[in-house]
């Protein structure tokens, strides 16, 4: 027994040296009662010798292998922080907040077309206001523009100028209602150059009142035209007398004109004796105005 124990100790020492530090090997007696280290593959040795090992505590647990993290994609410069699903701490909260932020641009995209439509409408209104302003300015310019030379004179004439023009004018009475200014001008054509022919008409009916005024270029033509007094014009004997200027504040009814309002139809002639029709004019208080004006019954043609 002593020899067997010594052999086992020697074998253990030899096995310990060959197995590395901290490793112990024990030989268990075989079936024949002898302890020994034989070839496990030899015949008759199966189950005769069993080997047991005692491992150190450090060798019982395997060393953990370091886990390699998958490479993360690099974000381009200036890109925002990790988005949803990045796996970073607090990413769940960050995922919720960007979700709200992303919903705001959607609402803004819905409001943008409405805002653009409002701005477009405002621009259209401003353009319309500018056009209206331009039209108003144009109308004011046209209203402030001086009338043609043939009609402007009587409107801006002073009393002295009016008297001078009346001194070159005559009154023609008992004129046929169907007579025209051209026919009257032709009737007095031999007396001198005619500047203006005015046929007075009733304001309400528009029918001629049966008398007219003829303005010549010089006073000599007035004296010549008086020779046509009681001459026949369109089958009627007309009355030709010099025209008299009405002074402000003086009213005369000695000519027996009806107390009614009237308007005048005036035709002007320039120095070259070319004619043009100037429309209906009125002669309140001896003055000629453009358009349809009113005159009282105390008007005197002289």
Swiss-Prot record:
Residues 1-12 have a biased composition (Low complexity). It is found in: Cytoplasm; Nucleus; Nucleus speckle. The RRM domain is essential for specific adenine bases recognition in the poly(A) tail but not sufficient for poly(A) binding. Involved in the 3'-end formation of mRNA precursors (pre-mRNA) by the addition of a poly(A) tail of 200-250 nt to the upstream cleavage product. Stimulates poly(A) polymerase (PAPOLA) conferring processivity on the poly(A) tail elongation reaction and also controls the poly(A) tail length. Increases the affinity of poly(A) polymerase for RNA. Is also present at various stages of mRNA metabolism including nucleocytoplasmic trafficking and nonsense-mediated decay (NMD) of mRNA. The modification N-acetylalanine is found at residue 2. The modification Phosphoserine is found at residues 19, 52, 91, 146, 231. SMART domains: RRM. Transmembrane segments: none annotated. PANTHER family: EUKARYOTIC TRANSLATION INITIATION FACTOR 4B/4H, POLYADENYLATE-BINDING PROTEIN 2. It comes from Mus musculus. This is Polyadenylate-binding protein 2.
């Amino acid at each position: 027994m002593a020899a067997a124990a010594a052999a086992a100790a020697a074998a253990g020492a030899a096995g310990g040296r060959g197995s590395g530090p901290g490793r112990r090997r024990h030989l268990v007696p075989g079936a024949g009662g002898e302890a020994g280290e034989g070839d496990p593959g030899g015949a008759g040795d199966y189950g005769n010798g069993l080997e047991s090992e005692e491992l150190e505590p450090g060798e019982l647990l395997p060393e953990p292998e370091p886990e390699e993290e998958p490479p993360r994609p690099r974000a381009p410069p200036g890109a925002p922080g990790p988005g949803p699903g990045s796996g970073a701490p607090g990413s769940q909260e960050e995922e919720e907040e960007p979700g709200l932020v992303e919903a705001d641009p959607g609402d803004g995209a819905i409001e943008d077309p409405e805002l653009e439509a409002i701005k477009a409408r405002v621009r259209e209104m401003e353009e319309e206001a500018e056009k209206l302003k331009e039209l108003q300015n144009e109308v004011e310019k046209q209203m402030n523009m001086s009338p043609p030379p043939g009609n402007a004179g009587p409107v801006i004439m002073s009393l002295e100028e009016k008297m001078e023009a009346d001194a070159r004018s005559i009154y023609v009475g008992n004129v046929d209602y169907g007579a025209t200014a051209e026919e009257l001008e032709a009737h007095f054509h031999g007396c001198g150059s005619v500047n203006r022919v005015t046929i007075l008409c009733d304001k309400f009916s528009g029918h001629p009142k049966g008398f007219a005024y003829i303005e010549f270029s010089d006073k000599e033509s007035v004296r010549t035209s008086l020779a046509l007094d009681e001459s026949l014009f369109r089958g009627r004997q007309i009355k030709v007398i010099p025209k008299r200027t009405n002074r402000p504040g003086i009213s005369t009814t000695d000519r027996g004109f009806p107390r009614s309002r009237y308007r005048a139809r005036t035709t002007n002639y320039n120095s070259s004796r070319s004619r043009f029709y100037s429309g209906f004019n009125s002669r309140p208080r001896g003055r000629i105005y453009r358009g349809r004006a009113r005159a009282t019954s105390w008007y005197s043609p002289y």
